């Protein structure tokens, strides 16, 4: 029962539950049973009790007699001595536990709501880490979700026995005392409630619960009207966050903030002191989800290993301003490194993070980012600055000791049709990402940094895009790329379809421009060499405008058993070119001419068709739907001389099964490949009743009726056997899923003319859905048909590709040919211990590209990885890419304290993520 009168509760918010009192024995003459007295509130607010009538009293049952415990006149609980006369040991102090839970309170730590793993429900197991032997489970109790403010909430009280002294205005309760007000509940063996002072004193097995927090102690003082409390010799638990600790005493403020004196903080299990934070003053704020501590030592097995005067840490997954876990590293080109991030929770929809990075060999790098999220957009600004004290590159061209980076990433919509996008990164020098790490989210480390902004309008049947895109070189081993400044595209489909005809159109107007670098490059030793841009010659040096129009008409015909789509496309391209004097003179020397205005018109005719057959079948006792899907594609494109057109954004696609059914073997619009071919492909699938595709096999080949004479600049079809062949290589693709955990993918392209493999790959991947911590990858790749631009010669190369030309000082045969195997594994060998390994080997150059091996230890509250790694490091001191490759090795240690974050070894996470397929999924699903 509860007292609802605000006037009375303000005086003394307490009503002893009569039904409980009537059932329990009372010890002394001062103890009264509620059933034998009529009690009411007097005018002064005190108790007014009178004995019931004799008649009523006769009907009462006899009073029971205490046999073991009673409430004394001074409010203490007395117990009979044991027959052996042994003294009961006094309570153990939390300081004696050395970071563990107090076993003297319960051997199984049930006093901390600890539930062993075998007793958890399926839902609780799903929220429990794989290596945790249990979890903190808050028991269901009345009022636990009550949101009533403490000052407005009535108090409920229960106990086995009670006594009230009217003169002192003190109520004494004994035996399983429970006080509940709002969401807070306090339990103890005995309690003395002082009406005049509105406070309570509790002794023996004190437990205070509120908002997912539990505080356990030997005794406590409680302010009855506000909920403020002090618990001595305290242990605490935050259930949802798996956080626990202890303190000399814990104070609960009126706003539910918990303050600990000489307290500890850890996410380890009650029987573990693997790591703890110990501080003079620790504050835990459930309202914000963060805690603070002063004069803090990080202790491992109760041994101090690190000191900080102040720390700010999360106690759940909410955002809050403050320091994030630091990162410590040593070695490399930067020496000892310390990163101490500070997070600014500016608003629910935007925040910022500052990353001060101290590097012993370079100085202080200040880096920061600002993130925003609005109803129609999201994005991130970032920047970094360093006055570099390292002078290893002081002789190199393009180096600047004032290092900086700026970036902006944005995606947004002005409304449902207008879209905006920005992807912009700029750096001080091309060596920035080779020398310096970045902590910003979304910054991509590539050789060509994107500097792009676009505005898109999406109509009902068309889209229009205004795009401006430039590139910043983050390397000296490549030539300057073309910028698109600006680019306009309009693509769509006409909204009417007479007789089933479909009218499509693609239009583009774009300006290609670049400033080629001239002069010489100076390497680390002060040696001079010609810039790579000087290798670009003739028409390849041109800038220009390009207008491309590509309307088409098709007649799609679809049936349940197949499809047929004849299509006619017409491509018209107009160029307005400009060429510098060097390019003109080189063109004239080779017997060529330059025309600033060039156009090209090419019709394209194709017929795409396919059939669909299926049947129900059974394979090894399993029912499947087996399909057979033949496809026939005919393409005719007449030859058009395009040698007077530069290749602004064009290259040749590598051969694959999907390339059999394209209408242009080139990417971009500067080359339209002449074709007269018939492609045949067949796909076979095995599909389970639930839609799961167990197996897929596809094979195809093209028959050519004419040579392919249109080539990239400087490439002659007469020198290419594949351009004169009557048939294409056989293209095969195969995928088999043993189940949802095992997957095998492969592709294979075999040339019947040369009777050799053009390219191929096979990849085996294993990662169980139920056990994502198990990963096995094995793959093999071979490719000798690449078509690429060679920066060292300024020419397009067909085949595997050498670096340079025979006789050049930096010549490397088959540098770009790929023939590699890649094996990686993460596998539990015993509980909590996993093996980590990768080996990537280049058969072509007979060298290991990367190899590492080590182990991981993972338990409920911390994780450690120790990895020995060898890799080919790439650090540019020369324009010749092979000269910048050098073998390196190191031993890497990563330690993660769960609940605090990584203490050291962030680079381990980086190369594991890059080198082992499935690693990121493993970490995302781990606890």
Swiss-Prot record:
Span of the signal peptide: 1-22
Pfam (any one): LptD_N
Keyword annotations of the record: Cell outer membrane, Membrane, Signal
GO terms under cellular component: cell outer membrane; transporter complex
Quaternary structure note: Component of the lipopolysaccharide transport and assembly complex. Interacts with LptE and LptA.
Protein family per UniProt: Belongs to the LptD family.
Compartments where located: Cell outer membrane
Primary location class: membrane
Keyword Heme: no
Annotated segments matching region Disordered: 60-100
Gene Ontology biological-process annotations: Gram-negative-bacterium-type cell outer membrane assembly; lipopolysaccharide transport
Name of the protein: LPS-assembly protein LptD
Keyword Membrane assigned: yes
Species, as recorded: Pseudomonas syringae pv. tomato (strain ATCC BAA-871 / DC3000)
Biased amino acid composition, Low complexity: 70-86
Domain of life: Bacteria
InterPro entries: LipoPS_assembly_LptD, LptD, LptD_C, OstA-like_N
Entry-linked Gene3D superfamilies: Lipopolysaccharide (LPS) transport protein A like domain
